[in-house]
């Protein structure tokens, strides 16, 4: 019996010596997010997993937890800082409550007209500066992923600011977004993303804001009668990682993961617009939600009500940051 055990141990040692990788446990990256698999972010997370595992030849294992199955959006940031999860892709609105208020520049209504303008910021000096500010929070920023431009939804027709008066509108935790709703005469309601469907269904809130992909994949078209194509803001994600975990990775692994993330980012941003266009068409075909296209006059009224939110938040976000975004995009008040 002892001799058989000795032979087995020696054989195992021989395999380990012949192939050191076989003796090593893979590095596990838990990647948590709050949206469905069939959204731009959901698909990009799965693509990153595929690339990371293939390119590291199994030395890294990426476990993706979609749809708030591991943490809700109000919990995940603390979990990342504590090291309970290694990677997230939260909306950039989440960094304001963390104390990095400069990120709330992305929440300013009508600051971007299109993805090209957005990318001039995320790919430029402002995007890099914002990621540097996360380092003191035990967070390393890896990439910006697009979702899409937001539209307002409700259970009554919404075309101009007066239509929002007294309406309870769900928002992410962001002072800027709260000011946005107040500027329209509505009542902002901060709520976890995973709770929104039920809140809309039961009338706890009257409406919300989302890109079409989130609106459709979370089945909000089942509980919202109207969707106004306001394109009043963006939801942009930042892929972030626990700084201590990232810094301790072997240099070759880190380099490989950076390459995988770069390719996953291109994939995410390439599909974002199409995914939202497809989702909007699916909402249209489902026939449960009336889609409202604003006239030029209605759009002008919305902008007139919302653009002052920029000035209101200069001291909070930083006038210099807002000015740099204006300069990069050519924004004119």
Give residue spans per PLM region:
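Twin-arginine (Tat) signal peptide motif
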Residues: 1-7
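Bacterial N-terminal signal peptides
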Residues: 7-16
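Sec/Tat signal peptide C-region and signal peptidase I cleavage site
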Residues: 15-23
């Amino acid at each position: 019996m002892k001799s058989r055990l000795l032979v087995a141990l020696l054989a195992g040692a021989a395999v380990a010596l012949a192939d050191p990788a076989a003796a090593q446990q893979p590095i596990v990256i838990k990647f948590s997010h709050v949206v469905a698999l069939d959204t731009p972010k959901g698909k990009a997370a799965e693509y990153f997993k595929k690339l990371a595992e293939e390119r590291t030849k199994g030395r890294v294992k990426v476990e993706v937890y979609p749809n708030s199955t591991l943490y809700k959006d109000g919990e995940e940031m603390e979990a990342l800082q504590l090291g309970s999860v290694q990677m997230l892709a939260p909306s950039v609105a989440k960094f304001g409550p963390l104390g990095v208020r400069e990120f709330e520049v992305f929440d300013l209504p009508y600051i971007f007209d299109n993805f090209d303008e957005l990318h001039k910021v995320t790919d430029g000096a402002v995007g890099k500066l914002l990621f540097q500010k996360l380092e003191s929070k035990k967070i390393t920023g890896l990439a910006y992923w697009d979702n899409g431009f937001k539209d307002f939804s409700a259970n009554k027709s919404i075309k101009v600011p007066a239509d929002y008066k007294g309406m309870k509108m769900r928002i992410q935790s962001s002072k800027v977004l709260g000011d946005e709703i107040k500027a329209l005469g509505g009542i902002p309601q901060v709520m976890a993303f995973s709770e929104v469907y039920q809140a809309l269904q039961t009338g706890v809130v009257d409406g919300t804001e989302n890109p079409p992909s989130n609106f459709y994949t979370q089945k909000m078209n089942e509980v919202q009668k109207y969707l106004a194509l306001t394109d009043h803001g963006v939801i942009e994600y930042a892929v972030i990682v626990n700084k201590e975990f990232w810094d301790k990775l072997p240099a070759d692994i880190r380099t490989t993961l950076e390459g995988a993330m770069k390719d996953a980012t291109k994939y995410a941003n390439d599909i974002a617009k199409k995914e939202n266009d497809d989702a909007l068409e699916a909402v249209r075909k489902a026939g449960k939600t009336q889609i409202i296209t604003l006239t030029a006059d209605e759009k002008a009224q919305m902008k007139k009500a919302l653009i002052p939110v920029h000035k209101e938040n200069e001291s909070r976000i930083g006038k210099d940051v807002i000015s740099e975004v204006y300069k990069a995009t050519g924004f004119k008040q």
